Amino acid sequence: MRATLLKETIKNLFPIKRTISIEGSPGGGKTTIVQEVAKELGVGYIEKHMPTMLVEDFGILYPNGDEMLHYKLPDWFPYEGRDDIPDEGILCFDDRNQASADLQKVLANICQARNLHGKPMKKGWMVVSTGNRQSDRAGANRVLSHLRNRETVYELETHLDDWTSWAIDHGVKPVVISFIRFRTALLLSLI
């Protein structure tokens, strides 16, 4: 799916909060597209880079004085009842398929049950994951089946016209745009 169509698709899926995953070549703009959609919709945006996270980053057990252990939820999780996080937004798990199997199990619970350790995520939040394709040999692991089955997967296709539009919108110098349009293979070999 091309970038412009993918942006519109995410916008159309936002009202129903369908969990999606975007896969594509390394550096192809997957996360940037999600950021731009959140900005265009005027909603909150939280991004977590999965290769740098541990299971403990999703909550720590602590005794609460009642002979039971409770979870201290992470500051970034948009759970119901929080006033310091917008009511609507996109929670993006970047490079999700570089996460360990244990982290993917936690993510599956967030995607399926829309909660973390029993605390429900705000109803206005959508979960989007991004990641590289295994065929690109960019460190992508196999995604667990029970996680993959709970999301819609879109593959971002790289097109020169999409890149050119992005470059113009982001102030890339015309000489660079002209050079890349002349030597397109250089752009595609980097992405």
Regions inferred by a protein language model and the residue ranges of each:
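C-terminal helical "lid" subdomain and adjoining coupling/linker elements of P-loop NTPases
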Residues: S189-I191
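AAA+ P-loop NTPase catalytic core and its hallmark functional loops
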Residues: M1-F182
